[in-house]
Regions:
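Short, intrinsically disordered, charge-balanced linker/junction segments flanking boundaries
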Residues: 1, 162-171
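Alpha-helical repeat/alpha-solenoid scaffolds of the HEAT/ARM/MIF4G superfamily
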Residues: 2-160
Length: 171
């Protein structure tokens, strides 16, 4: 538990540093951004075994935490916040990097959906985090990035899952 809190705090620290104008030059390097995306963001967006156990044991609690935002101190929420910060400050650079990882995640899912469903879950988190530009607790997301075709992503990736006859098999 302490380790997870440390990861969450480290991700929050990176978000704060990325927002500061005097440190932005560090994050403008494409190699650094790619390393942060690959080695920090993606692993912490993954739906982990502990997440699955909480969902299986108490789905209402899992959903409540997610909707209410009481998962604020989790590594997954901190990774989402880091994605939002990076995409708001380095949108064009980050779009290409995350686009490649999104393609990798969705390809992995398509290879074996029953086994690789976590890849699609991570992809969805990545897209929603990247697309978010502003919002409120009451209304949710109120502004989105123009670079992210959310209706198209939803039509191609979300709706088919919801329309699947056995949609509770995975995802």
């Amino acid at each position: 538990m302490i380790c997870l809190q440390l990861v969450s705090n480290a991700l929050q620290f990176l978000s704060v540093v990325a927002e500061r104008s005097n440190y932005r030059k560090i994050f403008e390097n494409p190699e650094i951004l790619a390393n942060i995306c690959e080695n920090v963001v993606i692993p912490n967006l993954d739906f982990r075994q502990s997440d699955e156990e909480l969902f299986e044991d108490s789905p209402e609690e899992y959903i409540r935490r997610d909707i209410e935002g009481s998962d604020i101190d989790t590594r997954r929420r901190a990774a989402c916040d880091l994605v939002k910060t990076l995409s708001q400050n380095f949108e064009a650079k980050i779009f290409g990097i995350f686009g490649r990882y999104l393609e990798i995640l969705l390809t992995k899912y398509k290879e074996n959906p029953a086994v690789n469903w976590r890849s699609k879950d991570t992809a969805i988190y990545l897209v929603t985090s990247f697309a978010s530009r502003g919002g409120t607790q009451k209304h949710g997301i109120t502004q989105v990035s123009e670079l992210v075709p959310l209706p198209q992503f939803c039509a191609q990736q979300i709706v088919p899952e919801l329309e699947r006859p056995n949609s509770n098999t995975y995802l």
